[in-house]
Amino acid sequence: MKNYNLKLKIFRFCIVIFTFAFCILNLSEANAQQVSLAISPPLIQTVIKPGKAILIAYSLENSGDPTILTARVVSFEPKDNFGNIRLKDRAEGPVRFSLDNAELSLDQPFFLKTKASEQLLLRIRVPEGAPEGDYYYSLLAETTPAIGREGIGSAQAKATIAANILVTISHSGTIEIKPKIVLFQLLSKMKWKIFDSFDEVPLVLVLENQGKNLIRPEGKITLRGLLGTSADYEIVPKNILAESQRLVQATPSAEFSKQPISLALSGFFLGPYKLSANINFGENSPNIFASTSFFAFPFKLVAGIILVTIITIFIIKRFSADED
């Protein structure tokens, strides 16, 4: 009888555990909503005269679970000199935005099914008398938690996707280009610009945009060494927003370095070297220049040879003394 009661208790315990695990798994599966959104075009750069407007057709795709989305436009500004931006809470400046869709409006939620897409017709209007300059915005599509029967939002993943809009307001269409090289420097562990022949030579190039319109640098960094040897490294063109600074990279890209640099020179270097930058910003734009130099010597190799020589001489003398 006791064995029967024990088996019954074990059976009931297993039933409870199984039921609990089944509920937890189902609950996790129900709550783990997948959100996968895409928007195109991801970037718009345009010049608009005051009193004019343009219409941009965006395609918003949902590859995840059905979701409720809200489209809105906010301003952004440079966050640092690495190209990162900081979104603001609302749209600032004179530019006006609206949706030309019959059933959609900005800041109003709408439903998007799985594997469905929605076209957002964004009208960008610049009123008369708007001051010239650059204004930067992001079109955001954000998921909105669905409201349950008891007025409580359901637990689901929060997702936001953005498409940046770079607006230049100009009466004549002329762009102000005022660049400056604020840093063209080698990062050396020593006080002087001296490197070991086998070490990586890191270079930092930072440009400043002192104008009211964004600029896009082009050009190259040239390395010249002994006997007239040289190598060119092309500047990677990236936008520098108005009145901001940005670290500029050259190919081969320095993105894999542990520190933020523009170019990582690797190989075997010996003797004096000169680095020069020649940068332009399109046709009829000013060229800006900068240069620096460094010296390379195989200190580690020479130190290793000296150490091996000293050890060898010591061993030879030791054996000679033992034989005597």
Q: Which residues does each PLM region occupy?
A:
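Short beta-strand and strand-turn-strand segments in soluble, beta-rich domains
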Residues: 36-40, 84-108, 223-236, 287
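Short beta-strand elements of extracellular/lumenal beta-sandwich folds
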Residues: 50-65, 197-210
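Short proline/glycine- and polar residue-rich coil/turn motifs
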Residues: 48-50, 109-118, 236-247
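Membrane-proximal extracellular "stem/stalk" segments
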Residues: 171-303
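N-terminal edge beta-strand
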Residues: 33-54, 180-197
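Ligand-binding face of N-terminal immunoglobulin V-set domains in extracellular IgSF glycoproteins
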Residues: 55-59, 67-74, 95-153
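Short acidic, flexible loop segments centered on an aromatic residue
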Residues: 65-94, 208-228
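Short, basic, low-complexity termini and linkers enriched in Ser/Thr/Gly/Pro
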Residues: 1-32
